[in-house]
Amino acid sequence: MEYYRKLIGERIFLAPVRIEDADKFCRWFADAELAMNLTMFDRQMTKEREEAILSDMVKNNSQIFSIVINNEEQLIGSCSLFDLDHSDRKAELGIMIGDKSCWNQGYGTEAIELLLDYGFNILNLNNIYLKVFEYNERAYKCYNKVGFKEIGRHREARIIMGRKYDEIFMDFLASEFTGSKLSDYFK
């Protein structure tokens, strides 16, 4: 089944998430290396539960997208803006590149840039924030590269095998965002 192209980048596009992809997401969540970077690391995920989560996110007006490689229709992950607060114009960003063969290739960076552009210029958000665990160095570097700033820490928030790690809070303000690709549509 073909994905609908909502936000198109150079190498990827973001498409509305499809409930039928829940099985693939569950297989990715079962991978401990990937799952330990997510907030749901300690939970079992079934296809039915993932379908329910995706349905709830769509119903609750979360902006959740599949990340798909251009010209291949290959699903490699998902990203979202959730907990949207239209009064204070803020939302939380989440991203997962589930296909490990696509790690360290810039797909996550491109997806985040598309999502920021959409959040600031279409949804009219002022603040997009996220959380990342300090051991997830790849993600932390990506967020810094895109322009997120560290704004605080929840110290020793995650304990794995007796070792304690901070949860890092980062955000990005609309006034700091300069990389709009969507502006080409509105000249």
Tell me the role of every PLM-derived stretch.
Residues 99-101, 105, 134-135:
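Active-site acidic-Proline motif in GNAT/NAT acetyltransferases
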Residues 104-118, 140-145:
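Conserved acetyl-CoA-binding loop-helix of GNAT-fold acetyltransferases
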